[in-house]
Amino acid sequence: MAYSKIRQPKLSDVIEQQLEFLILEGTLRPGEKLPPERELAKQFDVSRPSLREAIQRLEAKGLLLRRQGGGTFVQSSLWQSFSDPLVELLSDHPESQFDLLETRHALEGIAAYYAALRSTDEDKDRIRELHHAIELAQESGDLDAESEAVLQYQIAVTEAAHNVVLLHLLRCMEPMLAQNVRQNFELLYARREMLPLVSTHRTRIFEAIMAGKPEEAREASHRHLAFIEEIMLDRSREESRRERALRRLEQRKN
């Protein structure tokens, strides 16, 4: 009986696959700088030429970017599928924000569910840290800081779900999500009596994730976004009433 020769994988191929996996699962984040070549070769326990070959191939694939004298970075444009013009277009059509909220219902509910089910101690530490950052920003009345903390909190929850497709969907949506969160906070800061209720909703999501209760986390996420949607609808109705009143006033003048 003839046996085929077992081919050992090329070392640079193994390194390439490992780095690809770290990018895919989100361990290496967009824009993140890789350790220096010498240090990275030591961590992988490989030769520098093999590492260099793997990095060159990942650079050719568009996953890494090497800057002369500045190191090697994960491409920051990997998840920027929704371009600035599209974000601007959506902002010019307020009704699209309701479509985005519906999408957030689905994605954030799933993320909260699986974060409660799968989050590690390190994931929970990160989520806890960002939840506290949101509280501090709200206490100081810093709209910009609170909007950014909420965005980073949602990214951390999605990372804790350990679903690479879900994470990369969120990364693609990040510019739109950032704008939506910001607009929602502008509305909430104009109706400050609503802020404590929003905080209560978010705390329920946080506590369910920390307690490992996936169904409660998902339901709390849905209730939170439904509340935001209701506030947006109230504003839309108020604006419609104001426009009708102005039209009547103009008619009387004429």
Swiss-Prot record:
Cross-referenced InterPro entries: GntR_C (IPR011711), TF_FadR/GntR_C (IPR008920), Tscrpt_reg_HTH_GntR (IPR000524), WH-like_DNA-bd_sf (IPR036388), WH_DNA-bd_sf (IPR036390)
Show the PROSITE patterns listed in the entry.
Answer: HTH_GNTR
Keywords for this entry?
Answer: DNA-binding, Repressor, Transcription, Transcription regulation
Domain of life, per UniProt, equals Bacteria
Is Repressor there in the keyword field?
Answer: yes
**GO MF:** DNA binding; DNA-binding transcription factor activity
Residues covered by the HTH gntR-type domain:
9-77
Residue spans binding DNA: 37-56
Describe its function: Transcriptional repressor for the pyruvate dehydrogenase complex genes aceEF and lpd.
Name of the protein: Pyruvate dehydrogenase complex repressor
| Source organism of this protein record | Salmonella typhimurium (strain LT2 / SGSC1412 / ATCC 700720)
